[in-house]
Each structure stands twice: as structure tokens, then as C-alpha cells.
Amino acid sequence: MERDLESAPPSAPRPPLGPPLSSSIGLALLLLLLALLFWLYIVMSDWTGGALLVLYSFALMLIIIILIIFIFRRDLLCPLGGLGLLLLMITLLLIALWNLHGQALYLGIVLFIFGCLLVFGIWIYFLEILWRLGATLWQLLAFILAFFLAIILLIIALYLQQNWWTLLVDLLWLLLFMAILIWMYYHGPRHTDEHHHDDSLPHPQQATDDSSHESDSNSNEGRHHLLVSGAGDGPPLCSQNLGAPGGGPDNGPQDPDNTDDNGPQDPDNTDDNGPQDPDNTDDNGPQDPDNTDDNGPQDPDNTDDNGPQDPDNTDDNGPQDPDNTDDNGPHDPLPHSPSDSAGNDGGPPNLTEEVANKGGDRGPPSMTDGGGGDPHLPTLLLGTSGSGGDDDDPHGPVQLSYYD
């Protein structure tokens, strides 16, 4: 499942919404200026228009609010601009109801009730948006109280029919919407990174390097398997903690090395992450008969306890280490050869740490007599090349002898 998610190509990101055209901004600014002039003319005039004058000035103020939202925060046109547009339609409906009679009046009242319910629903939706943006309960309560206070003051203005009171009510509505805009400007998701990088997913360049490494080393897979696991189907000569210069911590199931492939389809018996492996190297289970890798930090050995505090360079389950083993521990020794072309340390870890039995019950690794000699003089075959004259690996096999 994880491999499917890693191998799936990322979906194409949605292009960000660009700024509005200069012509649309110019038209909006012109309409905003005209609306402000008409609003000031209506409010400051000596007309005795009564309640209709209050509704006309309030409708112009709603148009001004919608234009301000369009110019400065177009992303809020859906919730906040829609709320202002519905309030504008309800205001125009009230102006029409003033001259309706009979059945048309009842129909207008029904439409007015439906419009008020729709405004209430959009207001609840807008409060949910504020809640998701991090608004506290007290902030939401303050917005609700300010909204209902503005409605009550508008009703009072309809009864008073005074120009100065209408001016104060309209400015209160403008301040309410501007306060919401300012709050969302400082608390909204601004400058979000749509291409969020997940550190658990492999880098595309790393995936390319892994595939090229696999294609280059497929021809040496059989010889590599014989050198590390010995002739025949017997147990391997040494565990993965001795590493090889040709291997690498790519942590993928297709690696031809015996380092750490972490997948059940590996061609080797080193670390395929399953309790049914024919070897005792790394079956990722606490009931293994060896002390190699039981996936627990309390193991008596220093091989692979899956913790970042291990003193060895064996396998602490991380692909970012400067060595060829895969240890992911902050206390690992520095790389031996920084000039390695693969970016790793270019060589196996300290053999004295891995070959010597550090008081654990693991014992020496599996060994062979090296060709039928004295059984008390075993040799270990290390590396990935078969003979010293192989052009693929100039280092050749490394032999290490144990003496009684």
C-alpha cells in the first residue's frame, strides 16, 4: 500500500488564482466612487423620503461593501460577498413591498421570509469558516452580536427616519464587514505552500538514482549473492551489517545488495521484513533465535535494534546517513570517504566492531573454511566482486581469518 502511494505520480497542482484584470479593477473603482457619491448625496440631502430613503442609502452601502470585497479580497466573494448580495436583494424587496397590495404583498412577504432564512444559513456557513480559520468562541460570539446589533439599529433607523442616524447605521455595517475582512486577512490561510513536501516520500532524483543503480548491478547479482551467502543454499556467511562498497541504503525492495531492502520480494535472504525468512538475519520479529535484528531497543547486541542511539553503523532504518549501511542515528561516525561518487562513505563500517562479539549471545557470524582448509582457519568473503581481477570492483574480495 505504501509502495503504491510512493510510486503514484503526484497530481497536477491547481494553478493559483491570478490577480484581476486591470480593466475590471478600474471598473470596480469607478463604480465604488459613484456609489459613494450617491450614498453621500442621499444621506446628506434634506429629502423627506421617509423609510425608503433609509433603505436606498443602506442598499448603496451594501453595493459599496460588495465592491470593496471584489477589489481587495476576491476569495471571499462566495461567503461574504454572497451575504451582502442577499442583503441587497432583501432591501430591494422591502422597497418593493412598500408599494404592493393584496396577493402580491403576501407573495412578497413569503419571498422576504425565504430570503431572511437564506441569509441566516449563509451567516452560519460563514461562522463555520471563521471557526476553521482559528476563531475562538468569544470571537464568534462578538461577530454574532455585532451582526444582530446592526440589524436592530437598521430597524430603529426605519422608524426614526433621521439622516444622521441613517449615516451612523450605514457606517456601522461598513465597519462590521471591514472588521471581518481584516480579521480574515491576518488569520486566513495566506501564502500556503500547495506543493507540500512529505519527507517520508522519496525524492524524484533519489528514485532515478535507485533505478539506475538497479539496472547497472543486475548483471552482477548472481556473483554478489554467491560471495555474500556462500555456495549453495546454506546460510549466509555474514550478516548485512558488514555491507559492501557496491551496495547502498536505498531502502527499496529492488536493491541487488544485501544492505537493507525492507521488502518481501528481495533476491537475497538478508532483510525482507518477514518472519518466514530462511535465515536468521532480520525477520523483524522479537522471537528470532538470533540477536541480529529483533526490532527492539533492548537487544544485547549492537547490530540493528531499530533505534537512533546504536553505536554501530549497521542499520537503523534511515536512508539519509552518510554511510553505505543505513543507520539513521545521530551518533554514528563520520563518513570515511566523502569523495565517493554515490555520496556514501564508500566502504564498510569498522570490522572490529562488527566481527568481535561484544558480549552478546550472537556469536561469530557464519563462516566457511575457504576451500577445504583447516576448519580452525575460517575466512570471510566480503564485498561484491568475485575476484581481484574483476574490472567492476577494483577492491576485490576481502579475506579475514580467525585464529584460536
Curated annotation (Swiss-Prot):
Keywords: Activation of host NF-kappa-B by virus, Host cell membrane, Host membrane, Host-virus interaction, Inhibition of host innate immune response by virus, Inhibition of host interferon signaling pathway by virus, Inhibition of host RLR pathway by virus, Inhibition of host TRAFs by virus, Inhibition of host TYK2 by virus, Interferon antiviral system evasion, Membrane, Oncogene, Phosphoprotein, Transmembrane, Transmembrane helix, Ubl conjugation, Viral immunoevasion. Residues 45-51, 97-106, 161-163 are extracellular. One of its GO terms (biological process) is symbiont-mediated transformation of host cell. Residues 194-404 are annotated as: Disordered. Residues 251-322, 375-384 have a biased composition (Low complexity). Residues 370-404 are annotated as: CTAR2. A motif (Interaction with host TRAF proteins) lies at residues 204-208. Two regions, C-terminal-activating region 1 (CTAR1) and CTAR2, have been identified within the cytoplasmic carboxy terminal domain that activates NF-kappa-B. One of its GO terms (cellular component) is membrane. Residues 210-224 have a biased composition (Basic and acidic residues). Ubiquitinated on the N-terminus. The keyword Phosphoprotein applies. Its main location: host cell. Residues 194-232 are annotated as: CTAR1. Residues 1-23, 73-75, 128-139, 185-404 are cytoplasmic. It is found in: Host cell membrane. Belongs to the herpesviridae LMP-1 family. Pfam families: Herpes_LMP1 (PF05297). Acts as a CD40 functional homolog to prevent apoptosis of infected B-lymphocytes and drive their proliferation. Functions as a constitutively active tumor necrosis factor receptor that induces the activation of several signaling pathways, including those of the NF-kappa-B family. LMP1 signaling leads to up-regulation of antiapoptotic proteins and provide growth signals in latently infected cells. Interacts with host UBE2I and subsequently affects the sumoylation state of several cellular proteins. Interacts (via PXQXT motif) with host tumor necrosis factor receptor-associated factor (TRAF) proteins TRAF1, TRAF2, TRAF3 and TRAF5. Interacts with human protein ZMYND11; leading to negatively regulate NF-kappa-B activation. Interacts with host UBE2I; this interaction induces the sumoylation of various cellular proteins. Interacts with host IRF7. Interacts with host TYK2. Signal peptide: none annotated. It is a multi-pass membrane protein. This is Latent membrane protein 1. The lineage of its organism: Viruses, Duplodnaviria, Heunggongvirae, Peploviricota, Herviviricetes.
